[in-house]
Each structure stands twice: as C-alpha cells, then as structure tokens.
Amino acid sequence: MNNRGRYPPGIGAGRGAFNPNPNYQSRSGYQQHPPPQYVQRGNYAQNHQQQFQQAPSQPHQYQQQQQQQQQWLRRGQIPGGNSNGDAVVEVEKTVQSEVIDPNSEDWKARLKLPAPDTRYRTEDVTATKGNEFEDYFLKRELLMGIYEKGFERPSPIQEESIPIALTGRDILARAKNGTGKTAAFCIPVLEKIDQDNNVIQAVIIVPTRELALQTSQVCKELGKHLKIQVMVTTGGTSLKDDIMRLYQPVHLLVGTPGRILDLTKKGVCVLKDCSVLVMDEADKLLSQEFQPSVEHLISFLPESRQILMFSATFPVTVKDFKDRFLTNPYVINLMDELTLKGITQFYAFVEERQKIHCLNTLFSKLQINQSIIFCNSVNRVELLAKKITELGYSCFYIHAKMLQDHRNRVFHDFRNGACRNLVCTDLFTRGIDIQAVNVVINFDFPKNAETYLHRVGRSGRFGHLGLAVNLITYEDRFNLYRIEQELGTEIKQIPPHIDQAIYCQ
C-alpha cells in the first residue's frame, strides 16, 4: 500500500519520512532527520537555552530549579533584564497612567474630552442660570462620563429637573424637542442607583424601539465609569435572549412598555425593588395604544416609587393620569413657544406630480449635512426612496413594517453618517437625536400640529440651526393655516435663494 496516499498534501511524505516543514513533528519513532530547532533571539532566548542545556539529570533537581525560576519571575524581574526590576516599574507606570483615578485631584484635566462644538446655539439651550454639573454633588465617576460625553454645563431643562429628581419627588416636565431631556432624567437615575445591589432599581419606558436603543446608549456612555449594568429590551427581538440576560445582574432597564410588561408577567423581570420609573415621550405613552400597558406595569412597582414624565406636548389625558399616579408632582414648563428658535420653516405650493422635481431642486440648492424626508404612508416611503436613488442621491428608508434587525441596521448606519438622506414615516419623529441633521422635508404634510412639531424637531438639535421645508398641495392649504395658528409659529413661503447662514452655522 502506498503510504503517501494516506496523508493529505503538506502533512507528511509517508509514515516516518523526512518533512522539510520545521513545525511538523512526526508521530512515528522512525524519523530519519530531527526537525531543525527554532531560531530564538534576545537575552531571554540565550538564557532560556542555557538553562535547558545545563538542566540537571535528577527530576527533583529540575523541579526545584523550575520553582526557583517561577518565584524569580513573580518578583517582577524580566529574564535578561536588570535585577532591580526597573523595566517592570516602567510598565506598571505606563498602565496606571492610562487609568483615570476618580479620587485624584487632577481627574478633570486628564479626561479624554471630545472636540468642543463651536457651532452657534440658540437661547433654547443657552438661557441658563449658570449652574455647573458639579453643583449637584454627583458621583465623581458620573461626572467623568458627563464631561467625556461632551456636556459642558446643564441646559435649562437639566437645571430644572436634575436637583428635583435627586430629592425623590415626582416630576411632570415639558420642554422643546432637542433641548437635553434625555440627559435630564438619565443623570439623576444613574446617580440614585446603588451599583452594589444587583436588582432592577430603575425603568425607562419609551414608545419606539429606535428611541429605546438610543436612550440605553446614552445611559451606557454617561455611566461608563460606573459599574452599572444597563439592559435594553424591545419588541421584535428574541424573548429568550432577554430572559437569559435578566438572569444576570441588571440595574437599569430601558425598553418599550409591551415587552417589559410581558417579561414582568412571566416573573422574569422583578420590579419590587424598582424605585424610579421614567416615561419619555409621555404623551405618546398615554395614547390608547400604550396607556393600558403602562398602567398595568405601574401596578408591579412599589408604592414608594418615583415617576418622572418628560415630553414636548401634553394632551388632556395627562391630567387624569397625573391625578391618579403622581404624588404632588413638580411641574416644569419651558414651552414659552412650541417650535425651536433655531429652526426656519418654509412652505412651497406644488402639485402632487411636481413633488419629485421640487425635491430634486432642493437637493441641488441646499447645503445638506443630513436630511430626513417624511411621508404619510409606508408604501410612499419605499417608492420615494427608490426615486431619490434613481436621481443619483444616496438614500436609506425606514418604516414600521421592516424587520427589526433591518431597522436597527439602517438607524445605526444613518446615525454614523453612512448616508445623507433618510426617508421615513412618523416612526422616526419621536426623540431621535442625530446632531448632523440640519434639514427636514415634509414630502407629505402632516395632518395635525403635534406630528408637525415632532417632525421639524428632528433638525436644529440642542440649540443648533435647522431648516424645515413643507411641500404643500391644494388640499393641504387649510392644514397649513390651522397648524400655524395652533403652534403660534410662522411658516413662510420659500424664497428663490435660501441663505446658508440660517441653517448651516
């Protein structure tokens, strides 16, 4: 029998034959030529080779020599180095310098701060009382996360809500879109969590899956120097994975009401020690779609819980909910006007068949960092995205009927700047914070003022400038007038030329 045929190429030239590969060790005792030794360099290699050449013949002597060598290494001396261990000291110093000690005096000077944002900001975020984050006596590790996130000082909503939330009082807060509401409740929640107590101590509920992912990411970034475990759970993802995750320590749970309620009713999510419930976009959570789930979820919380409600709009249903579930709430209202000061709003009268041509003109004339284009139906989203791509512009689309994994990927890629334009339904109007978006286009004009307010609030985030353009058909003209009156804002007719200074600074 031909022995060569038993081995695949590169393994051996038959049993016992010589193989030129220096790393090949024959299993046979009949190897004709010993494999060449590896070539080793440096003092360590020479010392190591000499030790083995001078190895004692007695087994117990060899073991004793090995133990001495291990002890010698454990004392921190590198073989071939100086006996005083200077090299190890240098390595230790290098490692220690990369870790910021929160107890050191110069902790703030050693933070890895992002590049300062020098863009113009409006009074929506600059009209503060002059407080600093350090005035609230927060944990040093939390302050480190706040500054490394790029926050310099509290915005007006943060100045109002953080000290009150830290006292344990219920809050009903109303502030404009894009003025820092997320940090206004994340900071006090992270401050109040005991990281040594491995139970769920706070729950943040939001109406959409994308907002849940965004909020959990903000919590993780702010608390990255704390040992707080943040978990996000939403519908459309694996229930089994969520159940397995809840068997691990979780301090802060972020998610949509339906999924959290489902896990709670199964007995997997235990909320008896949860002292804080945050309702972001509370007006949406109190709509007919979510309110039964929210009220059922509250029944699992202890009587002494704290409830924080944040939104830009509060319908009449909020008053009934407030009277039943909130105890002497502290009311914050920073809505002297509904729309953001930095957003300039225009309308253009067009026929339905002219909308694509008008959109193409806007793309060619405007200085767009990123834009969001809103449609009123799922079908129109996909069709419009296809048309924009055919015009030669990069474009993503997202709507509620897409698979959750696909939605997550689109949201993540658009947020990271992989694409300039996003076509979507009202799924994307709530809380989504993408700082690079400076233009919002209502391809289909919304039916009510609340939807319009949340749509245009996707641009001009955190006091920056933005532009909203509305394509108005003959049937939309009454809606345009009514929304102007309800919001107390002015939507001007679009001029032939738009100055970049009003939306690009």
Swiss-Prot record:
Cross-referenced Pfam families: DEAD, Helicase_C
Query: Under which name does UniProt file this protein?
Result: DEAD-box ATP-dependent RNA helicase 8
Q: Where is this motif: Q motif?
A: 131-159
Helicase C-terminal domain location: 342-502
Which gene name belongs to this protein?
A: RH8
Q: Which residues carry this modification: Phosphothreonine?
A: T237
**What are the residue boundaries of the Helicase ATP-binding domain, all occurrences included?**
162-332
The record's PROSITE patterns line, in alphabetical order, gives:
DEAD_ATP_HELICASE, HELICASE_ATP_BIND_1, HELICASE_CTER, Q_MOTIF
Q: Where is the composition biased (Polar residues)?
A: 20-31
